Each structure stands twice: as structure tokens, then as C-alpha cells.
A protein has these predicted regions:
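An extended, acidic
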Residues: 1-149
Length: 149
């Protein structure tokens, strides 16, 4: 079974779902669960074959990555570079052929990375790699450091 987590970034979600579709015919089960630490613990325990997600933060995955590596699994970015605290897009697996097969399937549908330009979004949204920015509210809502506008 493979798990993915379509994060709040709509472009990363599209990429995740492309991979989801490609993997659907190759595995016994696919699930979407939005808790990286829990899913990574399941991979370490052997309940799941793999987990992939995009645009993650270190505090979401550091403990899970340690569990998987100590259990003999594999945690890499989408280019097979071993996990560091700066890894944002990742694949976790029980290692070996499973890891390689998931990566090759994701690559076959261009789901190893996501491109912000590839998604048509409403004009009021301005996507950045690390956060979603929306046009600022009227100035009256903003206060200076003394609490005055």
C-alpha cells in the first residue's frame, strides 16, 4: 500500500494526484492521509510499502525519517538524494526495489517535482514555494508595532 498527502499547495496537489493515478494500477492499495509523521511510522513498522509527498517541512518529517532509516527503510528526495532536514519533496519506503519502482512510476508521469507555472490559478492568488499569499486586506486592517494603524 502506498500513501500520499496532497498538501495545501494546489500545484503540488495536482502533481501528487498525477502520481496517485500512475501508481493505482501497480499497487494493491492507495490512500490519502494528511499526517506525515503517522504515515512514516507505519512505513517504518512495515504496515505500508511507501509514502510520498511534496513541500514538507522538517518538523513534519524528521522523527518519521529517523524511524524509517533505523528500521532499514529508505528516505530520499525525488532524485534519490538521502534525506536531510532541508528535503521538501520526499519518498519514504521499505527500501530496495520498492523505492526504485515508485520513483520510476512517478517519473513516468512527470510527478517527481512540481512546477508552479503549470497550474492555472485565480488571479488573486500569488503562489510561492513556501507559502500561499493572498492580496493584502485594506490598510485599515494593518497595525504598526504599537497597535495603531
Amino acid at each position: 500500500m502506498i500513501i500520499t498527502d496532497p498538501v495545501g499547495n494546489p500545484i503540488a496537489t495536482q502533481t501528487s494526484m498525477r502520481g496517485f493515478g500512475a501508481l493505482s494500477s501497480k499497487v494493491r492499495g492507495l490512500r490519502v492521509i494528511a499526517c506525515a509523521a503517522q504515515v512514516m511510522a507505519w512505513v517504518a513498522h512495515g504496515k505500508l510499502s511507501g509514502y510520498y509527498s511534496y513541500d514538507l517541512n522538517a518538523w513534519d518529517v524528521a522523527a518519521g525519517a529517523l524511524l524509517i532509516e533505523e528500521a532499514g527503510g529508505q528516505v530520499t528526495d525525488m532524485n534519490s538524494v538521502p534525506f536531510t532536514l532541508r528535503t521538501r519533496d520526499m519518498l519514504c519506503s521499505q527500501g530496495g526495489n520498492v523505492h526504485r519502482d515508485i520513483l520510476s512510476t512517478l517519473a513516468s508521469v512527470d510527478a517527481l517535482t512540481y512546477e508552479e507555472e503549470s497550474c492555472q490559478l485565480p488571479d488573486f492568488l500569488n503562489l510561492r514555494r513556501t507559502k500561499l499569499e493572498v492580496d493584502a486586506p485594506p490598510k485599515s486592517y494593518w497595525y504598526d508595532s504599537r497597535g495603531q494603524n
